Amino acid sequence: MRVGIGYDVHRLVEGRKLIVGGVEIPHEKGLLGHSDADVLLHAIKDALLGAVALGDIGKHFPDTDEKYKGESSLYLLNEVGRMLAEKAYVANNIDATIIAQEPKMAPYIELMRRNIAEVLGIKVEQVNIKATTTEGIGFVGRGEGIAAQAIVSVGQSLG
């Protein structure tokens, strides 16, 4: 078994959709980034890549490459899953935390879990997502951005 951790943060801006965990969430602001800026999936992808010593998402999906501009992070998560499979690894467990003052994430967490599990070909029970605030402290507390962190375990695939 191997373990990886990931962290990501993006600024909230007007004129962008808010996509977290592959779910479009109604909000007056969205996350700024080269792809769809899905902070949760970025943290999970970094954790998965780290667990198998493949670097990070910046190495594989650089923000200087136009082919990733506006790209769905679910698609990129699928690519990371493919990279794991090529090394004969599969995700055993994902535990992630979204850190956002607003909007509330609770209504969307189950759909996020299903999205992630489906893309990686694992059971929903292997994916846990939590959400918390910073009690009004810092850039997240002021509503300037959203952060996410993830820890994953991966094991050798049997097939």
From Swiss-Prot:
Q: Which UniProt keywords are present, listed alphabetically? A: Isoprene biosynthesis, Lyase, Metal-binding
- Its EC number is 4.6.1.12
**The record's free-text note on cofactor binding:** Binds 1 divalent metal cation per subunit.
At the top level, the lineage of the source is: Bacteria
Essential cofactor(s): a divalent metal cation
List of residues binding a divalent metal cation: D8, H10, H42
Q: Which GO MF terms are attached to this record?
A: 2-C-methyl-D-erythritol 2,4-cyclodiphosphate synthase activity; metal ion binding
Q: Which pathway, per its entry?
A: Isoprenoid biosynthesis; isopentenyl diphosphate biosynthesis via DXP pathway; isopentenyl diphosphate from 1-deoxy-D-xylulose 5-phosphate: step 4/6
Please tell me where 4-CDP-2-C-methyl-D-erythritol 2-phosphate binds in this chain. 8-10, 34-35, 56-58, 61-65, 100-106, 132-135, 139, 142
Q: Where is this site: Transition state stabilizer?
A: H34, T133
Does the entry feature the keyword Amino-acid biosynthesis, yes or no? no
Q: What is this protein's function per UniProt?
A: Involved in the biosynthesis of isopentenyl diphosphate (IPP) and dimethylallyl diphosphate (DMAPP), two major building blocks of isoprenoid compounds. Catalyzes the conversion of 4-diphosphocytidyl-2-C-methyl-D-erythritol 2-phosphate (CDP-ME2P) to 2-C-methyl-D-erythritol 2,4-cyclodiphosphate (ME-CPP) with a corresponding release of cytidine 5-monophosphate (CMP).
Tell me the subunit arrangement.
Homotrimer.
What is the protein named? 2-C-methyl-D-erythritol 2,4-cyclodiphosphate synthase
Q: Which organism is it from?
A: Alkaliphilus metalliredigens (strain QYMF)
Name the gene for this chain.
ispF
